[in-house]
Amino acid sequence: MGFMAYLLSGFHYFIEETQLLATANFLKNSDETRRFSKGVFESSAGANITRGAAWSIRTLAQALALTPDDDSLRAELLNSLQSNVAHYHRRYVETPNNPLGLIQPYD
């Protein structure tokens, strides 16, 4: 929501709005689901179906792109994005029994 608005207007308010949306995605998951401080968006847990996890990661990346280097939230956002990339790479790319990289279906 705030990403494109910030790009068009330059108002700092929209950076904070994007950061709020990214952190709200963390808070909608339990500690165990998001792997505590790693902030992983699991695609097969609760409301995070594949599409929901992808939207959460997109919002996280947008917040990271807008957050200035001297902002204290930047390190947390960067850690979470790196954890998500590592999680999904390990789960779908490195797994020898999943050569096509198919996404796990949800119930």
What do the predicted segments below correspond to?
Residues 1-107:
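Catalytic cores of extracellular degradative/oxidative enzymes
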